[in-house]
Amino acid sequence: MARYLGPKAKLARREGTDLYLKSARRSISDKSKFESKPGQHGRTSGSRTSDFGLQLREKQKVKRMYGVLEKQFRRYFAEADRRKGNTGANLLLLLESRLDNVVYRMGFGSTRAEARQLVSHKAVTVNGQSVNIPSYLVKAGDVISVREKSKKQLRIIDALKLADSIGLPAWVSVDLTKMEGIFKKAPDRDEFGAEINESLIVELYSR
């Protein structure tokens, strides 16, 4: 299945929540009515979504938030299920550990899509080594840096200014001047994703 390239606001309205696909400077929440579904009049009021529909919708929402396609998402779920602990929490921690997501969390990209592009274009390094695989899993203690030749990119400079103004998550440490950050640890489940109900995804794949 190809990656979705259409209007981001339409996706957010479909899922009923901000998917963080646009910069916080122009948050979709400021432009869209999440309760209104795509279409001229939206979904007919009073219709009830089935349990399967709710589970499928939650999976689609998380896939779109992290920019992951179905086949890869299934692999993440299988790995999460193999690991000790809560499968749903394991799944989200794997997604949070993706290099493109960490680059986004560190503020080098204003959106995950922009961060993914930076990784693909070799604009960042991991522990001094060039890594251009967005799905690369970052480990605690890894150092993510913007390459010297990329430090003058206006989109990175603007993204860092934005990150500085709204703050960074506790599990990363970033030197804004050096454009370098440390992935201190995988985040605790209660530190992110309050809008995600991962148990619905576990239920879907357990059918």
Curated annotation (Swiss-Prot):
UniProt cross-references to PANTHER family, sorted A to Z: 30S 40S RIBOSOMAL PROTEIN, SMALL RIBOSOMAL SUBUNIT PROTEIN US4M
GO biological process terms on file: ribosomal small subunit biogenesis; translation
Highest rank taxon of the organism: Bacteria
Keyword terms, alphabetized: Ribonucleoprotein, Ribosomal protein, RNA-binding, rRNA-binding
Protein family: Belongs to the universal ribosomal protein uS4 family.
The name this protein goes by in its record: Small ribosomal subunit protein uS4
Composition-biased stretches (Polar residues): 42-52
Gene name of this polypeptide: rpsD
Described purpose of this protein according to its UniProt entry: One of the primary rRNA binding proteins, it binds directly to 16S rRNA where it nucleates assembly of the body of the 30S subunit.
Protein's organism: Leptothrix cholodnii (strain ATCC 51168 / LMG 8142 / SP-6)
Stretches for region Disordered: 22-54
GO molecular function, a single term: structural constituent of ribosome
Skewed-composition ranges (Basic and acidic residues): 27-38
Ranges for domain S4 RNA-binding: 97-157
Pfam family, one: S4
Subunit structure: Part of the 30S ribosomal subunit. Contacts protein S5. The interaction surface between S4 and S5 is involved in control of translational fidelity.
